[in-house]
Amino acid sequence: MRKRIIAGNWKMHKTLAEAVQFVENVKGHVPPADEVDSVVCAPFLFLDRLVQAADGTDLKIGAQTMHFADQGAYTGEVSPVMLKDLGVTYVILGHSERRQMFAETDETVNKKVLAAFTRGLIPIICCGESLEEREAGQTNAVVASQVEKALAGLTPEQVKQAVIAYEPIWAIGTGKSSTPEDANSVCGHIRSVVSRLFGPEAAEAIRIQYGGSVKPDNIRDFLAQEQIDGALVGGASLEPASFLQLVEAGRHE
């Protein structure tokens, strides 16, 4: 049975004081790490303080993106070495907002995935279709292409450690969400792609999240699906009480 992973993506929200207070409020109340991986992915500026605040607890801290190079003339960027040095555990890569607003390509995402593994970070690799692609019946093809390109060059052992987040673009921040059955079908397709590329053991081990307007009142419907191993949550992860409801739902019944 795969351990579930519930990750909050704060995006560009909170002040440092608010972020630290959030961690102080939740860190003693998340489920044990051997039952659920509870993760907060915060803005770069907060990571150092949040890692310190969460130290010794079952709450893990993640970043929302990174550069693929260890160092260099990349003004404004943050490297995997810097994140690892801070004690960050996870990093979100290839989020649709990064792809749409900052021109990240599948090739760039792949470079970042490879760099994450080189530096001992666990990537949460995002994929998902637009509304137009969905209406054209291209969901499986689009997602399969994104996953195949993102994972290129990895070993089966590395793939087992990765996390994939299926986030249909049309469901992010819109209040609309895929049906649990639809999401399960796409996540199952992702697992079949991983099996074809890296073998059944890797496919059985890799964890696949659903994301897209996940809330405390619908998360259990998604987690009840066989192929869904967690959730990547935006707005509903910003309040301590809501976040704790989400991670508590991650326990296997």
UniProtKB/Swiss-Prot annotation:
Key words of the record: Cytoplasm, Gluconeogenesis, Glycolysis, Isomerase, Phosphoprotein
Under the heading InterPro entries, the entry gives: Aldolase_TIM (IPR013785), TIM_sf (IPR035990), TrioseP_Isoase_bac/euk (IPR022896), Triosephosphate_isomerase (IPR000652), Triosephosphate_isomerase_AS (IPR020861)
How would you classify this enzyme at the top EC level?
isomerase
What compartments host this protein?
Cytoplasm
Q: Which GO terms describe its cellular component?
A: cytosol
Modified sites of kind Phosphoserine: 213
Enzyme Commission numbers on file? 5.3.1.1
The record's active-site residues are 95, 167
A Gene Ontology molecular function term for this protein is: triose-phosphate isomerase activity
UniProt-listed Pfam families:
TIM
Q: Which domain of life is it from?
A: Bacteria
Q: Which SUPFAM superfamilies match?
A: Triosephosphate isomerase (TIM)
An example of a Gene Ontology BP annotation on this entry?
gluconeogenesis
What is catalysed by this protein? D-glyceraldehyde 3-phosphate = dihydroxyacetone phosphate
Signal sequence span is none
Pathway listed for it is: Carbohydrate biosynthesis; gluconeogenesis; Carbohydrate degradation; glycolysis; D-glyceraldehyde 3-phosphate from glycerone phosphate: step 1/1
Q: How does it assemble?
A: Homodimer.
Q: Which family does it belong to?
A: Belongs to the triosephosphate isomerase family.
What this chain does, per the entry, is described as: Involved in the gluconeogenesis. Catalyzes stereospecifically the conversion of dihydroxyacetone phosphate (DHAP) to D-glyceraldehyde-3-phosphate (G3P).
Please report the name of this protein according to its UniProt entry: Triosephosphate isomerase
Give the originating organism: Geobacillus kaustophilus (strain HTA426)
